Amino acid sequence: MPSMDESTLSASSRADLAELGQRLYDEALVRREDELITDPRGQPIGWLLDTRVPMLDGELFEEVGAVLAERLQNRGGHQVVGYGFGAYPLVCSVLSTDDDRFKGGLVREERKEHGRRRLVEGPLDEDAPVVLLDDIINSGRSASQALRLLRRDGWEVEGLLTLFNFTWSSGQERIRAEGLWTDSLLDLNLKDGRSSGSDSA
């Protein structure tokens, strides 16, 4: 079940975040009983979280954007980037809030070879740091790949903010070892051993 870091939240905020997290989890959860799902090697797995489903729902999109924006404001971050289809809706949700200080960027897998030939699309200030957004931090491989691409392109990445942290994995530690702060709205304490899986971070 999802849980959250309660140290800086009021009782009402904790309840609101728990309720939002449960809705995100319930709508994102896909089980093998419902459809065939596989890991990157093509082997069947028991479940995964497809956060694109709830994040492309208008109501949850706005609610999550408001929560992410508040976390970013508390850390002084106003430039956000996303790498991959799980992250792109998060970037857009932050930009949909009333705070017009936010700027967003979408990170490509490789620099575009024509046109403006950019790795990162969006109106970002290249001299200011960015915060990487992602839906899930699991092993940290996806976030590490995004970090390498961004650093190679000259960007300073100061932190990683995700919806879910899979607490049984070491992804957050892996990213912190790169000198970034990490934060997740919710810790996922569920473990399903061999049948666990996610196509994200």
Feature roles, as predicted:
Residues 2-26, 147-201:
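PRPP-dependent phosphoribosyltransferase catalytic core
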Residues 2-73:
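Active-site-facing substrate-recognition patch
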Residues 68-78, 151-153:
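Phosphate/pyrophosphate-binding loops at sites that engage ATP/ADP/AMP, CoA/4′-phosphopantetheine
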Residues 72, 95-99, 150, 175-176:
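A generic structural signal for well-ordered alpha-helical segments
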Residues 76-86, 161:
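Short glycine-rich phosphate-binding loop at a beta-alpha junction
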Residues 78, 128, 158:
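Conserved acidic residues
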Residues 85-131, 138-145, 197-199:
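Short, glycine/charge-rich flexible loops or terminal/linker lids adjacent to PRPP-binding catalytic cores
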Residues 112, 136-139, 163-169:
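Short Gly/Pro-enriched loop/turn and capping motifs at secondary-structure junctions
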